[in-house]
Curated annotation (Swiss-Prot):
Name the UniProt record assigns to this protein: N-succinylglutamate 5-semialdehyde dehydrogenase
Entry's family note: Belongs to the aldehyde dehydrogenase family. AstD subfamily.
Gene Ontology MF term list: succinylglutamate-semialdehyde dehydrogenase activity
Record key words, sorted: Arginine metabolism, NAD, Oxidoreductase
Pathway where it operates: Amino-acid degradation; L-arginine degradation via AST pathway; L-glutamate and succinate from L-arginine: step 4/5
EC number(s) recorded for this UniProt protein: 1.2.1.71
Pfam families assigned to the protein according to its UniProt record, in alphabetical order: Aldedh
Sequence positions that bind NAD(+): 221-226
Enzyme class: oxidoreductase
PANTHER family, sorted: ALDEHYDE DEHYDROGENASE-RELATED
Catalytic site positions: 244, 278
Free-text function comment from the UniProt entry: Catalyzes the NAD-dependent reduction of succinylglutamate semialdehyde into succinylglutamate.
Reaction(s) catalysed (UniProt annotation): N-succinyl-L-glutamate 5-semialdehyde + NAD(+) + H2O = N-succinyl-L-glutamate + NADH + 2 H(+)
Gene that this polypeptide is encoded by: astD
Length: 487
């Protein structure tokens, strides 16, 4: 039950016991006691004590530890990928990709620190202007369940490089992945107190977010939770709040020559990771007319052949289970609400077993729904919207408070230029899936999708603050005095 990591040691939690389960088998994967408010207090105090020495450590020394962490990720790739698969249900092929991305993020983050922050000098009269960057102090990192290794890593790695200390609160649905990741950090030689792990559910998260001794909070998760955090920190400008949230993402399909290529990219956009990527396409906009009819028919044909299976099945499936049986039942309920509003099922979603997270890829035509809810349904539930022309498609695509990702599948380059100029989103792709993002590019969106860009270069920006100095090695009188001064 020693599942918390505080001040360099594994310790027991004093809060309620909870467990995680494999959503594809209902097998118990992890069990432990959650962190109480007192446990959170000890974790924050530990991080505060460790901050002075860690931030004073030479940057190269900090980077050496972070690089060792990356090397250990490569060595333990299979073990960590297996834990990710067991706890989240995602297929092993995808879990392995997640671990590889975690390791690759280290070099990207080190480069980002030097290029976007770091130290810069410029000569000036009687001295030099110096721009340095300083860490904030103790930061809380809240991680999601869909990428329980990679996404928290996108906050933790740049935070540590910059000299911050961290209290990490993972999703209660993926505590085993968090423990395995923190063990790798420990074995990489991270000093005691620099990274602390507090496991738990809502009460643990509230205790950490409310703690008056944190200097920043970095969050990846749902827009509803992120919005609550934003309200909570209203009137506290001293807190650095970085939010990366979800989206109601549109994929616009134009009339193209290669219809199977378009269907493939639509399948990837909507159903990769069982639809549990924040960049997945929730709305697929298809032209009215014969081409659109053929596209929808082909999309339904291919999607109907996708069979979800357990994470370690051989051969590997395209889709695993969604994160829990509860999440699966919520998706089926969301489908029922949309049908009640006038949506027409093309492929109806069904939950295979009420105790498991298996659902099939589903497609609804929502064109005739007059007041379509602006919601993110986090799973393989795609909505078809028919449009008349590109202007109509762009207007419908932008009809959302979110703005994370968007995509256009089109042979016409001019259509792409029109689309990219008019669309409102942080990730905008042409002839690529909406969930295709470069690890070396900013990741995030506009509107209710967030306020910062984690996981790549821009993460360095919110992990440190700029300190501007004008400096002269010699104290001396200026060559000329200001008017009215007499010496």
């Amino acid at each position: 039950m020693t599942e918390l990591f505080i001040d360099g040691a594994w310790v027991d939690g004093a809060g309620p016991v909870f467990a995680s389960r494999n959503p594809g088998t209902n097998e118990r994967v992890w069990e432990g006691a959650s962190a109480s408010a007192d446990d959170v207090e000890r974790a924050v105090a530990s991080a505060r004590r460790a901050f002075a020495a860690w931030s004073a450590l030479d940057l190269d020394a900090r980077c050496t530890i972070v690089k060792r962490f990356a090397a250990l990720l490569v060595e333990r790739k299979e073990a960590l990928a297996t834990m990710i698969g067991r706890e989240t249900g995602k297929p092993l092929w995808e879990a392995r990709t997640e671990v590889a991305s975690m390791a690759a993020k280290v070099d990207i983050s080190i480069t980002a620190y030097h290029e976007r922050t770091g130290e810069k000098r410029a000569p000036m009269a009687d001295g030099v202007a110096v721009l340095r960057h300083r860490p904030h102090g103790v930061v809380a990192v809240f991680g999601p369940y869909n990428f329980p290794g990679h996404l928290p890593n996108g906050h933790i790695v740049p935070a540590l490089i910059a000299g911050n200390t961290v209290v990490f609160k993972p999703s209660e649905l993926a505590p085993g992945v968090a423990r395995a990741t923190v063990e790798i950090w420990r074995d990489a030689g991270l000093p005691a107190g620099v990274l602390n792990l507090v496991q738990g559910e809502k009460d643990t998260g509230v205790a950490l977010a409310n703690h008056r001794q944190i200097d920043g909070l970095f969050f990846t998760g749902s827009s509803d939770t992120g919005t609550l955090l934003h309200k909570q920190f209203g009137g506290r400008p001293e807190i650095v709040l970085a939010l990366e949230m979800g989206g109601n993402n549109p994929l616009v399909v134009a009339e193209v020559e290669d219809i199977d290529a378009a269907v493939h990219h639509a399948i990837q956009s909507a159903f990769l990771s069982a639809g549990q990527r924040c960049t997945c396409a929730r709305r697929i906009l298809v032209p009215r007319g014969a081409f659109g009819d053929r596209f929808v028919a082909r999309l339904a044909d291919v999607a109907s052949k996708i069979t979800a299976s357990v994470f370690d099945a051989d051969p590997q499936p395209f889709m695993g289970a969604v994160i829990s049986a509860r999440a699966a039942s919520r998706l089926v309920a969301a489908q029922a609400r949309l049908v009640g509003l006038g949506a027409s099922p093309i492929i109806e979603m069904k939950q295979r077993d009420p105790a498991l997270g298996f659902v099939n890829a589903a497609i609804l035509d929502v064109t005739n729904v007059r007041e379509l809810p602006d919601e993110e349904h986090f799973g393989p539930l795609a909505q078809i919207v028919r449009y008349t022309d590109l202007d109509d498609a762009i207007a419908r695509a932008n009809d959302t408070a979110f703005g994370l990702s968007a995509g256009l599948l089109a042979d016409d380059e001019q259509a792409w230029h029109t689309f990219r100029r008019a669309i409102r989103a942080g990730i905008v792709n042409w002839n690529r899936p909406t969930n295709g993002a470069s690890s070396a590019a900013p990741f995030g969106g506009a509107g209710r999708s967030g306020n910062h860009r984690p996981s790549a270069y821009y993460a360095a920006d919110y992990c440190a603050y700029p300190m501007a100095s004008v400096e002269s090695a010699q104290l001396q009188m200026p060559a000329s005095l200001s008017p009215g001064l007499h010496f």
